[in-house]
């Protein structure tokens, strides 16, 4: 799985995910399913934001090849992927500027057009189950929830999917591609089933020679995925370096 992640995802995303896991005492080389899940979630957040702008009239537009002279503002503020302090600073700034209610938990995005925070979910299970879990945790009608699955299903608050159909289709296609690539390598079943993943993990650990500095016990703490990472982009070109590798995995 680790090799797959490094082949399939942009190196910047891999670096962010590695830093998040190591900060919480988790090893990407051991907890490879979590490694893959964090990379996937971060990539979906980028894709959700990518190409969406607000013009000088306040209208939402899609621009795939940017005009440097255009007065455009990113429609979405990416909160996911920043270190925790910076993320809360951004959230507080948005709340002070717009008057929206401050969320109890760090959301993933802010939508300047709809004036609401967004929580993005990517699940290997039934979308409605994961949606209810998210809603129960957040306990706020102000934060919009949008869940995607690897099977092409999605669920959003009040069936409001925020993005146009084509933009959502890009995300669904990417997730389906990840699933197919995992399946072709025999990785999908263990990625979906925690029980199978634990069995595979024990098998992998037994096959490894003892290594200095390598944790011998897997951490089961839940890390707030990517919430404590350093900000990697702060201007209008923040997603440009990632776009080329978003749509498909590298060939095996």
From Swiss-Prot:
The record marks 195, 198-199 as: Important for efficient shutoff activity and nuclear localization. One of its GO terms (biological process) is viral RNA genome replication. The record marks 202-203, 206 as: Important for efficient shutoff activity. The keyword Cell cycle does not apply. It is found in: Host cytoplasm; Host nucleus. GO terms for molecular function: RNA binding. Pfam families: Flu_PA (PF00603). Keywords: Decay of host mRNAs by virus, Eukaryotic host gene expression shutoff by virus, Host cytoplasm, Host gene expression shutoff by virus, Host mRNA suppression by virus, Host nucleus, Host-virus interaction. The keyword Hydrolase does not apply. Gene3D superfamilies: Influenza RNA-dependent RNA polymerase subunit PA, endonuclease domain (3.40.91.90). The active site is at residues 80, 108. The probable endonuclease active site in the N-terminus and the basic amino acid cluster in the C-terminus are important for the shutoff activity. The C-terminus acts as a nuclear localization signal. The C-terminus is recruited to host protein complexes involved in nuclear Pol II RNA processing. Plays a major role in the shutoff of the host protein expression by cleaving mRNAs probably via an endonuclease activity. This host shutoff allows the virus to escape from the host antiviral response. Hijacks host RNA splicing machinery to selectively target host RNAs containing introns for destruction. This may explain the preferential degradation of RNAs that have undergone co- or post-transcriptional processing. Belongs to the influenza viruses PA-X family. This is Protein PA-X. It comes from Influenza A virus (strain A/Duck/Hokkaido/8/1980 H3N8).
